[in-house]
From Swiss-Prot:
Residues of the site described as Cleavage (non-hydrolytic): 249-250
Cofactor(s) of this protein: pyruvate
Protein name: Phosphatidylserine decarboxylase proenzyme
First-level EC class: lyase
The family this protein is said to belong to: Belongs to the phosphatidylserine decarboxylase family. PSD-B subfamily. Prokaryotic type I sub-subfamily.
EC number, UniProt record: 4.1.1.65
Biological role: Catalyzes the formation of phosphatidylethanolamine (PtdEtn) from phosphatidylserine (PtdSer).
Assembly description: Heterodimer of a large membrane-associated beta subunit and a small pyruvoyl-containing alpha subunit.
Active-site positions on this chain: 92, 149, 250
Length: 280
């Protein structure tokens, strides 16, 4: 008797041989196109396909955007996302996982874990402040607002680009690609905060053409090398202010030290808005 095919597993396995970066660069070029008919068609098709709510956008007219990426990274109205108390969600999305960091282990999906040390770029000293701390993973779906904000006020200490693959990020790959978030290309941003150390990890994914930060712009590191930038002059970003954005896709993993406790309302799969209170 034939064993039924697990479609999620098949979807994940099909991605291994794909030229992830080549595909992402190609999509990125299309997303930057300023050809009116092409960008207007792409934006309107995207809005229909993913049921994007434009009523909260600062610019609600799809044709007003110069290119698809400008639409995708659209700003919201100033009153669209009130900022709650304590530690807040850095983005709109789904709280896919949260909880304790057990020594070097974080939960990726039910029954699947990955390494804190690997996530942060393979430096044990960098990972040490977060051992036995806590973490939260927010997945941004295509229809979500794609700017990333500070969950608390923080002083930027270090930025680390970590090269990697660009598997798509969703429940199928979380369940079937071991160490997904520590395997994909990512940007690790380390902050000092009143709640202790904070690592904001912006994880790339298939067709994520670029990651930007407010202090460095688009991050374009040397290919294939871990690149570390330390900041001697303080860069302070207030709670609720933008710290970065995805030009298409992906996921934010927050790692904290020992002084953060999640609120009772938090559950795996909770849909959250940027600014929504998650922890104290």
């Amino acid at each position: 008797m034939d064993t039924p095919v697990d479609r999620d597993e098949l979807f994940a396995r099909m991605q291994y041989p794909l030229p992830h970066h080549l595909i992402s660069r190609g999509v990125g070029k299309l997303a930057e196109s300023r050809t009116p008919w092409l960008k207007d068609w792409a934006i309107r098709r995207f809005i229909r396909t993913f049921d994007v709510d434009m009523s909260q956008a600062l610019e609600s007219d799809p044709e007003a955007y110069a290119c698809f990426n400008d639409f995708f990274t659209r700003a919201l109205r100033a009153d669209a996302r009130p900022i709650g108390e304590g530690v807040v969600s850095p983005a709109d999305g789904t709280l896919s996982q949260f909880g304790a960091i057990r020594q070097d282990t974080l939960v990726q999906a039910k029954g699947h874990t990955y390494s804190l040390n690997a996530l942060l770029g393979g430096d044990a000293a960098r990972a040490a402040p977060f051992r036995e701390g806590s973490f939260a993973t927010v997945y941004l779906s295509p229809r979500d607002y794609h700017r990333v904000h500070m969950p608390v006020t923080g002083t930027l200490r270090e930025m680390v680009y970590v090269p990697g693959r660009l598997f798509s990020v969703n429940q199928a790959t979380a369940n079937h690609v071991p160490g997904l978030f520590a395997r994909n290309e990512r940007l690790v941003c380390l902050f000092d905060t009143e709640h202790g150390p904070l690592a904001m990890v912006l994880v790339g994914a298939m067709i994520v053409a670029a990651i930007e930060t407010v202090w460095a712009g688009q991050v374009t590191p040397l290919s294939g090398r871990v690149q570390t930038t330390r900041f001697d002059e303080p860069i302070v970003i207030e709670k609720g202010q933008e710290m970065g954005r995805f030009k298409l896709g992906s996921t934010v993993v927050m790692c904290f030290g020992h002084d953060v406790a999640f609120r009772d309302v938090c559950t795996d799969g909770l849909v959250v808005n940027m600014g929504q209170s998650l922890a104290s």
